[in-house]
């Protein structure tokens, strides 16, 4: 079972990661990693980095049927 310290250490080693990458690396369920990242954010230890929509190749994310699912969210230590 992953701990907050393991999530923090992984972010320290890798710089920035997506929650799904952290989940796969630590072999932990995605909802648990999401909760841990939110807790680290509340504690002021981690920061959420949303991907900018200007990276969209077609430029039509607002009308995209995926609903901006192509935009990724990164996490990094503060």
Swiss-Prot record:
Gene3D superfamilies: Winged helix-like DNA-binding domain superfamily/Winged helix DNA-binding domain. Keywords: DNA-binding, Iron, Iron-sulfur, Metal-binding, Repressor, Transcription, Transcription regulation. One of its GO terms (molecular function) is DNA binding. InterPro entries: FeoC, Tscrpt_reg_HTH_FeoC, WH-like_DNA-bd_sf, WH_DNA-bd_sf. Iron-sulfur cluster binds at residues 56, 61, 64, 70. Belongs to the FeoC family. May function as a transcriptional regulator that controls feoABC expression. This is Probable [Fe-S]-dependent transcriptional repressor.
């Amino acid at each position: 079972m992953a701990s907050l310290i393991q999530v923090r250490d992984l972010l320290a080693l890798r710089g920035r990661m997506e929650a799904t990458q952290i989940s796969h690396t630590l072999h932990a369920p995605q909802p648990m990693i999401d909760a841990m990242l939110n807790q680290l954010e509340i504690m002021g230890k981690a920061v959420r980095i949303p991907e900018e929509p200007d990276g969209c190749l077609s430029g039509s994310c607002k009308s995209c049927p995926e609903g901006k699912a192509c935009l990724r969210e990164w996490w990094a230590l503060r």
